[in-house]
């Protein structure tokens, strides 16, 4: 108050000094006025004095029409005034060619009237929350609305007349602004009428919320049409009205909210009338029978929501006009009222016949003989994908040609066949080793080659070390056991840490098992059924007591080389092969796979052929001795 008085006194003193100085220089009225209008410092002082006078006039009108402003009304007024001043400055930039004292005066008057429109709207909304409304309040509100409506109509009429006579100018902006203010006055007057009717009735008016909702819907639609027409005309005749973007957006958002509220409220009220049951006297006695909306006791006409909260039907109807939630627990009544469609239970299937006691276990699908089946997917959900074992070699596939010359002697042939088998197994192991583990961007080196003299295959490459096992419960102290058993965060963390250690141990163990199985499958490729049968027969023949240890080793190497030779396509027999073996080979090629008798006869012939040079050497050694 003191600051406003000081500013008023200062501006008044400056204005008096400027006018006295101009009159002292010119000594006449007209030259003094011309001097004041041409001097920039004098015009600045006069502008300040004009703003002070407008401020004083506003305080006077506020005292007459509103009395003492409430804190919420003052806060809303200051908040909206800042936006209005910003939009006015943007309008100055758009109409900078029309900038003049008259232009500034018109915008100041527009801002002045906007402030009183906002105050009137807030004061009428206060009627719904005020229990006592005096006749002074009605007189002030009615007189203010009449004054604002008349002034808005006069300024709209003046703007239309100016546009028709002088063409499109800045009056286009003022005309649309005052038209929007007229819609605001209309909305305020309708709300005032509805609140007055509600206050005159003894019981609450149930349909007031419906009328207010449709009033906002109607006036919001008019505002949207006015802003769209204003934007279209301004873009065509002048430029893009940047200052009208924010109010236009607010008008559209308000209209959209009104449409949504109208639709959702009708749906909620329909659900209340059709789906929600009436509260029985037992329900009212079991709970508090005071409606929290109107704070009155519920005797009849109460509805029970899906959340078991009870309210007056009229209170719920007015509540659902604004929001579709329970007043107590804020549950969405529209979502809760949707019927829950439970799926029909499946038809009972006939029980499957019990399996026999000695039923054979079906073999796994797509697993070669001699291979260990892979783990089913999803057994260990925290694992990544691991490379599988290589597929077994197909018997009868063409072998890679070698440049090593074929020796003529039988001993050299046996040695070469043994070396070739070793090289071939090494190459297969190197090629079948996984190139890279999942999750590593670099390529892993191949595992160590298998050696016949090693009793066990080498360990798998890059095998992860086992984590330390968790401490035994018997070795834990009493404090640690109490920490595991206690309630709260520390106990929960201790139990989770113990479970995490067990989980880590299981993952590490299964990872090492998988590495071991992959390495074993890589180093020991499976054999076909024919080779398995031949190996068993050769083992029976070699187990005879008349064969020495050295002969047994030579027979194994020779049998392996003979099997690899017979299984390879396009291989020619050496010169030491007998005519009987050629006939047997031709019969096998004509008839397909040989029978068991043919295999036995072939093995015996090979043994005789292999043992003959050894007996000759023994006779030569005996004759020399």
Curated annotation (Swiss-Prot):
Chain sites annotated for binding Zn(2+) 2: 307, 309, 326, 329
Membrane topology: Multi-pass membrane protein
Gene Ontology biological process terms, A to Z: ERAD pathway; proteasome-mediated ubiquitin-dependent protein catabolic process; protein ubiquitination; ubiquitin-dependent protein catabolic process
Pathway: Protein modification; protein ubiquitination
Start-end of RING-type zinc fingers: 291-330
Protein name: E3 ubiquitin-protein ligase synoviolin
Residues that hold Zn(2+) 1 according to the record: 291, 294, 312, 315
Positions in the Lumenal compartment: 26-40, 120-135, 191-212
Domain comment in the entry: The RING-type zinc finger is required for E3 ligase activity.
Composition skew (Low complexity), residue ranges: 423-434
PANTHER family hit by this protein: E3 UBIQUITIN-PROTEIN LIGASE SYNOVIOLIN (PTHR22763:SF184), RING ZINC FINGER PROTEIN (PTHR22763)
Residue ranges of the region described as Disordered: 337-361, 390-434, 462-487, 523-625
Ranges annotated as spanning the membrane: 5-25, 41-61, 99-119, 136-156, 170-190, 213-235
Disulphide bonds in the chain: none
Lineage: Eukaryota, Metazoa, Chordata, Craniata, Vertebrata
First-tier enzyme category under EC: transferase
Region Interaction with p53/TP53, annotated ranges: 236-270
InterPro entries: HRD1_E3_ubiq-ligases, Znf_RING, Znf_RING/FYVE/PHD
Top-level taxon in the UniProt lineage: Eukaryota
Residue spans, topological domain Cytoplasmic: 1-4, 62-98, 157-169, 236-625
Family: Belongs to the HRD1 family.
Chain intervals with Pro residues compositional bias: 342-361, 462-471
Pfam families: zf-RING_2
Self-association state and partner proteins as the record states: Homodimer.
GO MF terms held by the record: ubiquitin protein ligase activity; zinc ion binding
Main location: endoplasmic reticulum
Cell compartment(s), UniProt: Endoplasmic reticulum membrane
